[in-house]
Amino acid sequence: MGSSVRKKKEKKKDFQKTKLKVGKAKEKPASFTDTSFKSRAIVVAQSSLTVEGPNPVEQFKHYLSLASTSRSENQRRDALAFLTTQLSHQPPNNPVGTPAILAKLLPLISDSNSGVRTQLYKLLQAFPSADIQPQVERISMYVRAGMTHLSADIRDDTLSIMEWLLEVAGSEVVSCAGGWMKTLNVFAAMLGWSSIVAANAAAAAGSAPRNKGWTSAPKSTFGAAKGGASYARQLLALAKFLEIGFRPEATGSGGQRTLWNSLYRLPRTSNPFGYLNLFGAPRDEDSEIYADREDRQRVFSRKWHAVITKGLEEAKKEGGAVGRAGAVLNQTLKDGLADYDDHVL
């Protein structure tokens, strides 16, 4: 009986207000902990406090690995943004080299996420032109694959990369292995001119052309706003590509100095004798290097001139932006092939 009364009093005491007396300190609770002491050091288990930050080289490699292998779209995009920031510094922070970066990131040209593709485009623009020019052949392979992708958005984004590549390394694009013929094949497929190519090939072989199905019909935008804009961009990109390919080579002033330079000066390109294909596999016509303007004019006139001329006739019928782009392409053809007959004769 006594214990129950004592417990009731203790419970009741918790709800009673303590009367404070003047000059007497407030009673401390039973769980009070004295924190008035001062410590000279704080020891945290399994942790270290250091002034030095993460290793910049390892951090760069970590984000490069995230950008190329992460399954998360947000992680890939954010990693590309970090790499773009590092490459945009003055001087650029590129500890692994441009070839290593491109080898890991070029497959992202056909990434399914538009944010990743946009960020990759910004990263490519951060590279100096001198770093891009020796890597044009590798870049062109992925760009050609993206330009013939099933997704229209991926084709449009890849076309932006092609436009940028023509700006920074146009002469290398048209003169690398497969850069002339394979790129023309891709433009023909993108513009819907594959049926014209097949018909011309059948006519040259002397066989009757096959009936065209709905999959091989010439491309038409039917007045669609987005489709018309994309079609016009493709025509203008093709015009830019042909303008660079038909551009006359710069000629020196001649003289004794030019002769000595041609004999003893070190080449500026990474593979100056690549057009000879001394140690590579045999190339077909599409994979060949067309290093000078005359070779490009010759093969274009034989295989592509009639195809593009017929495709332009269909493009001009649409008018608007497509018609104007077709006029630019038509003028490029006239200027580029104006002196071709003179060279042949």
UniProtKB/Swiss-Prot annotation:
Keyword terms: Nucleus, Ribosome biogenesis, rRNA processing
Recorded GO CC terms: nucleus; rixosome complex
Major subcellular location class: nucleus
InterPro entries: ARM-like, ARM-type_fold, Ipi1_N
Subcellular localization, as worded in the UniProt entry: Nucleus
Comp. bias (Basic residues): 1-11
Keyword rRNA processing: yes
Domain of life: Eukaryota
PANTHER family xrefs: REGULATOR OF MICROTUBULE DYNAMICS PROTEIN, TESTIS-EXPRESSED PROTEIN 10
Purpose of the protein: Component of the RIX1 complex required for processing of ITS2 sequences from 35S pre-rRNA.
Protein name: Pre-rRNA-processing protein IPI1
